Structures are given as C-alpha cells and as structure tokens.
Amino acid sequence: MIEPLLCGIVLGLVPITIVGLFVSAWNQYRRESAMPDWE
C-alpha cells in the first residue's frame, strides 16, 4: 500500500520537474534563435 505522504510528494514533484524541463528547453531555444539578432 502506498503511503499518502509519498504519493503526495511524487504528485507534487512530477509536474514541477516537467515544467522545469520545459522552461529550460524553451529558454535554450529562445537564446539560440535570438543569437543572430545580437550580431
């Protein structure tokens, strides 16, 4: 049987991890796409 605390931690960390990866990937893509504009 899964402990409520462990289940809560997993349900809380998973969305944060997904959002964190998406934001970091978007920032990297935006930085690379905007690089030619600075030159």
Curated annotation (Swiss-Prot):
Quaternary organization: The 4 large subunits of the cytochrome b6-f complex are cytochrome b6, subunit IV (17 kDa polypeptide, PetD), cytochrome f and the Rieske protein, while the 4 small subunits are PetG, PetL, PetM and PetN. The complex functions as a dimer.
Job of this protein: Component of the cytochrome b6-f complex, which mediates electron transfer between photosystem II (PSII) and photosystem I (PSI), cyclic electron flow around PSI, and state transitions. PetG is required for either the stability or assembly of the cytochrome b6-f complex.
Any GO BP annotation: cytochrome complex assembly
Gene for this chain: petG
One matching Pfam family: PetG
SUPFAM superfamilies found in the cross-reference section: PetG subunit of the cytochrome b6f complex (SSF103446)
Family indicated by similarity: Belongs to the PetG family.
Protein name: Cytochrome b6-f complex subunit 5
UniProt keyword terms in alphabetical order: Electron transport, Membrane, Photosynthesis, Thylakoid, Transmembrane, Transmembrane helix, Transport
Source organism (scientific name): Prochlorococcus marinus (strain MIT 9211)
